[in-house]
Amino acid sequence: MIMKSTLTFILGFFLVQFSFAADDETCAIMIGDEIDPEEFSEVAGKKVYFCCGSCVKAFDANTAYYIKALPSLAKKFSDAEKKKLGVDKVKLMEQRYCPIYPERVVNPNSKFEVYKGKKVYFWSSSAIRRWKRDPDKYHAEAVKRGHLKG
């Protein structure tokens, strides 16, 4: 009987721990990438985990923007915390994703190129180099995915 109760307690403990970790299993900025427990930022006393240092750096430089743009991050903070961080003052861009790396979320400080009179934001310099090889092709692909307007 004691053994059964102990096993039930241990199983319950791990299920609770797993349910808390479930939200942080994938990166919010590089959508779908597994988080690295050593790559995190602490905001309002909460640890926000990412897959790599590049995401930590992007988040730290644009914290309020990413919290407003990404529901997975917004739900981690109360309305009062978001207000204190300035999330309510953030104006979201039309574009959310890099046209070359569509699983990566861009921000107003991301590198950009002007394409047919409009700014197109990119995750990295390597994304811009690929874009420049055939901007019409990559633009069409991003429009088809709904990541850029036509």
Give the positions of each predicted feature.
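Bacterial N-terminal signal peptides
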Residues: S5-Q17
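Intrinsically disordered, low-complexity terminal tails/loops enriched in metal-binding residues
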Residues: S19-G150
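N-terminal secretory signal peptides that target proteins for export/translocation
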Residues: M1-M3
